[in-house]
Each structure stands twice: as structure tokens, then as C-alpha cells.
Amino acid sequence: PFREGCVGESAAAHEARVSGEAADDEALRRVLAGIADDEERHALTAWKFMRWAVTELGAVARDALRDEIARLESESSPTRFDQGELSRHGVLDDDARLALRAEVVRDVVLPCARALLVADAGQVPLRAA
């Protein structure tokens, strides 16, 4: 749930949002914005599940989450990208997608995951990426 839901869906939402903002075609921008909205809802569901797991399963879930945080922190990914020519058509190249994923992990996933470990579940604000 954490890798696919929290990380994957958050990254997919950000990728769709950035792709849509870069697209020249208005219809494509609307489609990609809709996809981004859907992916954000999926990510939010995953984060809610993680909050439940940490609260209900206690140490087992917290230890597993700590392991995932450590894995994410040890991964290296590009942190900058040039959107290039394809971006105006709503397409990002592999380097751009990897850089966006790294941005989401750094700015959204890791802070939210750490918050789950230290805050009472009732105090953790959950927002889509």
C-alpha cells in the first residue's frame, strides 16, 4: 500500500498535473487535470489507510513504515529536468518523470510518512499531493 499507493499515486498525480500544465492543447490540459484529480484521490485513500495501519497495527506498521522511509531516502534520482519538446503535447520523458517522482518523495511522501510516525492519527492532516 505504501509504495504503490502513497508513493506511486502521489507521483502519478504530480506527473499528470505538470504534464497538463505544460500541454498546449486545452482539451488535453483538461483531460490531464482530471487524471491528476483521480490520482490525488487514490493517493489520499492510500494515506488514510497508512494512518489507520499505524494507529491500529502499532509497532509492526511503524517499523515497516520506517523501513520504507529509509529505502526512499537511500534512492538516488534526478532532481531537475528539462521538459523538452514533448511536454507541449502532455508527454514527459523518463528523466522528467524520475525527477518529478523524486520531488514528490522529498516534498510530500517523506514529510507525510514521518508525520504518521510522530503524530497522533487524529492530528495528522491528510491532503492530496
Regions found by a protein language model. Give the residues of each.
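Non-heme di-metal
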Residues: P1-A129
